[in-house]
Design a protein with these regions (language model features):
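Accessory, non-ATPase domains that flank or precede helicase/AAA+ motor cores in DNA-metabolism machines
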Residues: 1-228
């Protein structure tokens, strides 16, 4: 206890209280309320242990932690048009706040209920926390991250979760397009026009274009969202 100080002490004690309620707790559920750093600190002290217990069945009866929003006519038209079976490219043209995210969420729900995974790509690392929160607030599933801000260990964990099917959702920036997934069901690229999806140094590529190729190879749909489509 002497090793803990200030705000860290309060956060770590609160996390320990939460962990003590169950013998096993999903890492994804912990990260809804606590940072990876807080979890890592108590793990380093030997107070808690992070273990991999292999892919888990998604509890479809309790998949949703919050109910979907009602769709407006334009959103409903888009949902009715999007076929979550087989390859096709869908463009959702809408300004910020027009409801693209709710369409993404409801499409993701569909593929998870089919027993498949979703790859969601965003242009900037800074958008990760708010996007991750939206997914964790809606779904009772594992969400893996893939971006350059992760440590090697975190990147390995996310890679494993996606490749084994433990993570139902993989959220990441352009490099996420290369991450293997056990049973991919849909790819979603938000702000597809953003130049951040293009790697300009070293091995040059367009993550958006590669995602379309991957979707075609996997025979799954891909949704491109943008306020200013390229």
């Amino acid at each position: 206890q002497e090793m803990l100080r200030g705000g860290r002490l309060h956060k770590q004690r609160a996390l320990l209280d939460e962990l003590s309620k169950k013998s096993l707790t999903r890492q994804g559920n912990i990260l809804k309320f606590y940072t990876r750093a807080t979890l890592q600190r108590i793990e380093e002290k030997g107070i808690a242990e992070l273990v991999c217990i292999g892919p888990q069945e998604v509890d479809l009866d309790n998949l949703l932690l919050e109910q979907p929003l009602s769709l407006n006519p334009s959103q409903q038209e888009a949902m009715d048009a999007i076929d979550c079976h087989g390859f096709n490219t869908w463009l959702i043209d809408g300004v910020t706040g027009s409801g693209k995210t709710e369409i993404y969420l409801q499409c993701i729900e569909k593929v998870i209920r089919y027993g498949r995974q979703a790859l969601v790509m965003i242009p900037e690392i800074s958008l990760t926390p708010q996007t991750e929160k939206r997914f964790r607030d809606r779904f009772n599933v594992e969400v893996a991250m893939m971006h350059s801000g992760l440590t090697d260990q975190e990147r390995l964990e996310s890679w494993t979760e996606a490749a084994t099917g433990q993570a139902a959702i993989l959220l990441g920036t352009r490099s996420a397009v290369f991450t293997p997934m056990k049973n991919p069901g849909i790819i979603i690229i938000d702000e597809e026009h953003d130049q951040s999806y293009k790697q300009q140094d070293g091995f040059r590529y367009s993550a958006r274009d590669l995602a379309v190729i991957r979707a075609k190879q996997e025979k799954i749909p891909i949704i491109l969202g943008s306020a200013t489509p390229s």
